[in-house]
Amino acid sequence: MGLRYDLTLPLSRYYANNRNELLSPFKVIQMDRVYRAERPQKGRLREFMQCDIDIIGNESRDAEIELILTTTKALNRVGLTDYKVKINDRRILSDIFAYAGFAKEDNEKLAIIFDKQDKIGIDGVKAELEENGFDQTGIDKFIALFADGSLTLESVANVCDASYVTELQRIIDAVTKVSKGAIPVEFCPSLVRGQGYYTGTIFEVEAAGYSGAVAG
């Protein structure tokens, strides 16, 4: 017997075992209690309710657009209106790591460290990269991209595959158009989303009056 960590990994296993009998794309909404071995603190609970929406079997960016629109619609229904959607792509982040000269096999470790930026700041990220023995030239090159906060979706195309930028811009434009500008979406190059199973588009929602993300 064990306590369920989240809803996403069991869904992946279910889909892998039953994909031939399921509709494609497979759309799921589920809600249940999940458990984490967390040190209890503000925003970190050992037991909480997870509401999950997933689209499996559709590799187009249309799935990402639908997920953002559905998420924000749900937030509107529970009374949250003053929020913004932050968006990035893990492939862009991987290309940034490569641009700095880091080895591909270190990407996950790098992502875990970089994901702490909101808590420890860019100087803290630099210090932790140094503590973990990463090459100083690579560290300096990486930190320089984020030091002044001026890395935009347009400028990041200079250090990553331009197709990733095009796809991300399409998502932003589509959400903006469908919502008639009611859903603010902004590119956030420092957005990581800690789980290792993220490989493409990632997003999270920040709302006024709440610390951390309220959805993602």
Where are these regions (language model features)?
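Beta-rich nucleic-acid/ligand-interaction surfaces
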Residues: 87-99, 191-200
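Residue-level "edge-of-site" marker
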Residues: 88, 110, 142
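Amphipathic alpha-helical segments within well-ordered protein domains
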Residues: 72, 94-98, 111, 126
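Cytochrome P450
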Residues: 82-86
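Acidic, His- and aromatic-enriched active-site or binding-groove loops in soluble protein domains
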Residues: 1, 102-125, 129, 207-210
